[in-house]
Design a protein with these regions (language model features):
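Alpha/beta catalytic cores of group-transfer enzymes, especially the acyltransferase/condensing modules
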Residues: 1-106
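Acyltransferase/transacylase module recognition
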Residues: 73-164
Length: 164
C-alpha cells in the first residue's frame, strides 16, 4: 500500500495474502512494478486490462452509475449478499445501491470477503468462469477449502451430481 501511495496509484484488489492489484495511470503502474521488483517482492507485472478499474480514475463512471441506480427499484435481499467493497453483509435495498456505486472506485476486498464467509461457517464455494482463478485465491486465503469450479457443461453436470 505504501508503494501505491508513493507512485500515486490506487489499491484495486486485495485478492489474497501476497496478492494485491493496483490501478491507475499507466506511468504509475509501471513505476509500481519497477518498485515492487526493486523491493524484492516476488512478482510485479502489468495486467492487460481495458481500464483503471476500482480506482479514482473511474469517478465519472461512478457518477453516471449513481444516476442510473437512483432509478432502479431494488428489492430487499431474500438471501445474504456480501459487498466486497467493504467485506460485509449488505443490510437492505439502499445498502445494495450504495455498495454498487462504491464498487466502481473502491478496492475489492476479496480476501476479507472470503474470510467473512469462512468465519460464518461456509465450507464449500462454487466458482463459475473459464478458469479457476478464485479457487486459486481461496487456496491462498485458507488452504484446503473446497471450491468447485464450473467452466463448461461437463463441470456443471459433475457439480450438480455432487450435490444431488
Amino acid at each position: 500500500r505504501a508503494l501505491a501511495k508513493q507512485v500515486d496509484v490506487d489499491v484495486a484488489n486485495l485478492n489474497a495474502p501476497g496478492q494485491i492489484v493496483l490501478s491507475g495511470f499507466k506511468e504509475g503502474i509501471s513505476a509500481a512494478v519497477a518498485g515492487a521488483k526493486g523491493a524484492g517482492l516476488r512478482m510485479g507485472k502489468e495486467l492487460d486490462v481495458a481500464g483503471a478499474y476500482h480506482s479514482r480514475l473511474m469517478r465519472s463512471a461512478q457518477d453516471k452509475l449513481a444516476e442510473v441506480l437512483k432509478e432502479v427499484d431494488f428489492a430487499e435481499p431474500v438471501f445474504p449478499v456480501i459487498s466486497n467493497v467493504d467485506a460485509r453483509q449488505v443490510e437492505g435495498a439502499d445498502d445494495i445501491r450504495q455498495s454498487l456505486e462504491r464498487q466502481v472506485t473502491g478496492s475489492v476486498l476479496w480476501s476479507q470477503s472470503m474470510e467473512l464467509l469462512l468465519e460464518a461457517g461456509h465450507e464449500t464455494f462454487i466458482e463459475f468462469g473459464p478458469k479457476p482463478v478464485l479457487a486459486g485465491l481461496m487456496n491462498r486465503i485458507r488452504k484446503g477449502t473446497k471450491v468447485i469450479s464450473i467452466s463448461d457443461a461437463d463441470s456443471l453436470k459433475a457439480a450438480v451430481a455432487e450435490f444431488s
